[in-house]
């Protein structure tokens, strides 16, 4: 398997994290902070979108199961407006 060569792009995006251990050894870890940050950001947005969809779904479901007086009133008014528009057209 070929080793990846360092290009200016990888050199600029890679972050070298050097840690000193108690016994004097130094360990080196390569990180890609930009890609890690981007992935975290995407996951956060996706989870927010999922939560929003669930909330909208449950609100719709709850309004169907136990409609409040206000939601019934708006539904009836919407249907009445649609019905009266069709009457005008016909």
Curated annotation (Swiss-Prot):
Q: Name one GO biological process term.
A: symbiont-mediated suppression of host cytoplasmic pattern recognition receptor signaling pathway via inhibition of MAVS activity
Source domain of life: Viruses
UniProt site positions, description: High pathogenicity: 66
Query: Is Membrane a UniProt keyword of this protein?
Result: yes
Q: GO CC: one term?
A: host cell nucleus
Q: Where is the composition biased (Polar residues)?
A: 1-27
Which species is the source of this protein? Influenza A virus (strain A/Duck/Hong Kong/2986.1/2000 H5N1 genotype C)
Instruction: State the taxonomy lineage.
Output: Viruses, Riboviria, Orthornavirae, Negarnaviricota, Polyploviricotina
**What is the official name of this protein in its record?**
Protein PB1-F2
Q: How does it assemble?
A: Oligomer. Interacts with human SLC25A6/ANT3 and VDAC1. Interacts with host MAVS.
């Amino acid at each position: 398997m070929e080793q990846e060569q360092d290009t200016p792009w990888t050199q600029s995006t890679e972050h070298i994290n050097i840690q000193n251990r108690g016994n004097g050894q130094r360990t080196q870890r390569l990180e890609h902070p930009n890609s890690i940050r981007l992935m975290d950001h995407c996951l956060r947005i996706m989870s927010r979108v999922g939560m929003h969809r669930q909330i909208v779904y449950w609100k719709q479901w709850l309004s169907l199961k136990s409609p409040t007086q206000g939601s019934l009133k708006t539904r009836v008014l919407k249907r009445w407006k649609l019905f009266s528009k069709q009457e005008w057209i016909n």
